[in-house]
């Protein structure tokens, strides 16, 4: 477990890509308006639609890449129900994070409560290509921070 925690912390320091419902980062001049829109989306009926898209992205990626999941402790195998329940809990409680460590790819995917996106750290080229295709299939975009 210590190895996974250490690896997670190392990966958080590597190049990061965003799987986002927006096509590019928000410019500083538009942050206030974005926060208003983000608050609305996270606190309205739209939240369910966004949650479903995020869960779909995660589950599709898990079809191709095995991952250890950090949610209430490390899980070597994740179930679709665990992923959906974790994303739902994070969004409902407006707190928490879900981590997927793709150990064969040496990559990390993070979902945090205050984001309408996923953060993908140190993706292999294969993971990056597939993540982009999957993101598009769910109406999301992939770009590097």
Where are these regions (language model features)?
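Structured alpha/beta or helical-core interaction and ligand-binding surfaces enriched in interleaved
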Residues: 1-117, 122-145
